[in-house]
Amino acid sequence: MAKITGNLVATGLKFGIVTARFNDFINDKLLSGAIDTLVRHGADENNIDTAWVPGAFEIPLVAKKMATSGKYDAVICLGTVIRGSTTHYDYVCNEAAKGIGAVALETGVPVIFGVLTTENIEQAIERAGTKAGNKGSECALGAIEMVNVLKAI
């Protein structure tokens, strides 16, 4: 029985990163964590392109454009949605998650969900590089692994 795994080597790989401007004080940290991790694992900074969109809801469209361009081995999607007093949070979170997942399934390109969906600003800050690590960094690792596992199949 074969065990198929993906290594964490990003040498020669190209990445697209879509980042939401809304809550950019959090998303900047997620983006920095992702880029740092990609480079530490062998990616060339010149092989990492970033696109900024207004908010998390808009991420899937640009992710799809990147995924279908043929330029990228993987696309990383970063954003932050913090619960407010209305149901807007639920719609944005659900549609962003559905859209990002659909892009991966439709294109066959790894598209990594790195949109924080938090109850409050403290939880978002914790996940952007403090107590709970940096989710942007974790998404970069996931992107590298997915590219390599797909190549191994």
Curated annotation (Swiss-Prot):
User: Main EC class of this protein?
Assistant: transferase
* Binding positions for (2S)-2-hydroxy-3-oxobutyl phosphate per the UniProt entry: 85-86, 127
- What residues make up the catalytic site? 88 (proton donor)
The UniProt catalytic activity note for this protein reads: (2S)-2-hydroxy-3-oxobutyl phosphate + 5-amino-6-(D-ribitylamino)uracil = 6,7-dimethyl-8-(1-D-ribityl)lumazine + phosphate + 2 H2O + H(+)
- EC identifiers of the protein: 2.5.1.78
Pathway info: Cofactor biosynthesis; riboflavin biosynthesis; riboflavin from 2-hydroxy-3-oxobutyl phosphate and 5-amino-6-(D-ribitylamino)uracil: step 1/2
Q: Which UniProt keywords apply?
A: Riboflavin biosynthesis, Transferase
Record function comment: Catalyzes the formation of 6,7-dimethyl-8-ribityllumazine by condensation of 5-amino-6-(D-ribitylamino)uracil with 3,4-dihydroxy-2-butanone 4-phosphate. This is the penultimate step in the biosynthesis of riboflavin.
Give the PANTHER family listed for this entry. Answer: 6,7-DIMETHYL-8-RIBITYLLUMAZINE SYNTHASE (PTHR21058:SF0), 6,7-DIMETHYL-8-RIBITYLLUMAZINE SYNTHASE DMRL SYNTHASE LUMAZINE SYNTHASE (PTHR21058)
* Name of the protein this chain belongs to: 6,7-dimethyl-8-ribityllumazine synthase
Species name:
Actinobacillus pleuropneumoniae serotype 7 (strain AP76)
Q: Which gene encodes it?
A: ribH
